[in-house]
Amino acid sequence: RQTLSGFIQTAVLLLAEAVDQLILQAFRKDDYAVKYAVEPLLEGSGPLANLSVRLKLIYALGVISRDEYEDVELLVALNNELEQEKTVYSFTDDEVLGPISMLHSMTALPPPPTLHMPEDVVDDALRTMQEQRYQQMVRSALVLSITDLITRLENKKAF
């Protein structure tokens, strides 16, 4: 089973690839320009080596919408936070639900499970099953949201 941190990290890598393709479309295509101008900008310590800077550039050029820009920025920030935290979060923790509910590409999150039974009737197995089901529903909604975002970015043309 993939962890939340691994999931978000993979999503950010896929988003970075889509952003990179848009950046490359924005520059001249001749070999000389690519080798001596474009590559130094994008590699190592170049000014466009950072994903956040590349993202700002394609947003400023009007290649992506504000919603797309904000969604990628939010996922990058969540990824950075998860990498620095010592705590292992799940898809349904409040620290995760808050940020992902702000994604423009996210349809409404599924409601948390409510057991309409008296407390003494509900056993731990049922509660655990409901929590696992809710985790999977949130994960699925996030997969669909991120897939939609990546697809939209990959289908864009820089100019």
Where are the regions a protein language model picked out?
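Amphipathic alpha-helical interface elements
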Residues: R1-F159
